[in-house]
Amino acid sequence: SIAKTSATHCLQTLYRTERFPVIILRPFLSYGPGQDSSRFLPQIIKGCLSGKEFETSSGEQIRDFCYIDDITDGILKAMKSDNLNGEIINLASGDPISIRTVIEKVKTYIGKGNPKFGKIPYRVGENMSLYADTSRAERLLGWRSKTTIDDGIKKTVDYYRAYDPQ
């Protein structure tokens, strides 16, 4: 996050001093088919598909997941805009959800899985609430995330069932 903040400041300075054309997009927790299998959602999906116990935190963290097709749509809208130089725009669902709820939704859709909540401690300094204000994306791009977390989970689970057998 320090690197992202530094890059943002650098780009904003370039825009202000040199009129360097830049739009800063901040995608929040993108997920979907083909995502690196070491990431959170693929790990949960694989854990549930296996039907075996798997350890997780208590899941109280609040996050803002955004399906990859929606992120891509937001990026394309920003690229086609002529008057957004210097803007910082969050691309997110705007629907905060707990990690525990996401895990339960995956488990319910798959029909099996045995998460052991509270077995993994939170990371030191973990941000317990991380979600986006999407009002600038709506106002400046006319963009909103279209895919619900339920639909996104289903599409992602279906991908892993078909293309990433255990």
Describe each PLM feature range:
Residues 1-23, 49:
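Active-site Tyr-X1-5-Lys
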